[in-house]
Amino acid sequence: MAREKIVVAGGTTKSWKLLLGLRIFAFMATLAAAIVMSLNKETKTLVVATIGTVPIKATLTAKFQHTPAFVFFVIANVMVSFHNLLMIVVQIFSRKLEYKGLRLLSIAILDMLNATLVSAAANAAVFVAELGKNGNKHAKWNKVCDRFTTYCDHGAGAIIAAFAGVILMLLVSAVSISRLLINSKNFSTTATTTSVV
C-alpha cells in the first residue's frame, strides 16, 4: 500500500509545518534584534581634558539613534518581523485555502525581498560596529567600544540575532520557492491530464 502525501496550501503537510516553524524562528530572531538594538543605550562620564591637575569631565551617551545604519537596522528588522507575523497568521488561519499561482509567487517574492532587506541592514550595522570597535586610523576616527563596552556588547548581540534572521529568511525563501515549484508541477500535471482526456 503506497503512502499518499497530503497536499496543503501549495505543498505537503511536512513543508507547511517546516515553513511555519522557520517563520516563527525568523520572527523571533528579527524581533529580538530590533528590540535589543532599539533599547541599546549607555551613558558614561569621561575625562575629556585636564587643566593642570583638574580633570574636566563630560557625560556622554551612546544611543542607536546616533547612527543612521543602526536606525535602518531597527526599522528593517521590525519590517521583516511584521512580515513574518503576518505570514504566520495567514498561514495558520487560512490553512485550507488553495494557494495557487500569483499568491504563491507573491509570497515567494516578498520572502526574498525581506531576506535581502534584513541582510542589508545587518551588513550596514556590522560596518558601523567594526568602526566602533577598531576605529579608522586613516580617517582619524577613534574607536568607541573601549569606552562604551555594554553598548557595543548589546549591539553585537543584536547583530548576531539579525544574522540568524538572515539565515532563517533564506531558508524560508527556499521553502517558499520549492512550494511554488511543487504547485506549478502539480498544476501542469493536472492541466496535461485534463487536456489528454
Curated annotation (Swiss-Prot):
Lineage top rank: taxon: Eukaryota
PTM annotation (N-acetylalanine): residues: 2
InterPro entries assigned: CASP/CASPL, CASP_dom, CASPL
GO cellular component terms given for this protein: plasma membrane
Keywords: Acetylation, Cell membrane, Membrane, Transmembrane, Transmembrane helix
Bilayer topology: Multi-pass membrane protein
Transmembrane segments: 18-38, 70-90, 107-127, 157-177
Signal sequence range: none
Main location: membrane
Keyword Transmembrane annotated: yes
Localization of this protein: Cell membrane
Topology, Cytoplasmic side: 2-17, 91-106, 178-197
Segments on the Extracellular face: 39-69, 128-156
One Pfam family matching this protein: CASP_dom
Subunit structure, as described in the record: Homodimer and heterodimers.
Family statement drawn from the similarity comment of this UniProt entry: Belongs to the Casparian strip membrane proteins (CASP) family.
NCBIfam families per UniProt: A_tha_TIGR01569
Protein name (Swiss-Prot/TrEMBL): CASP-like protein 1B2
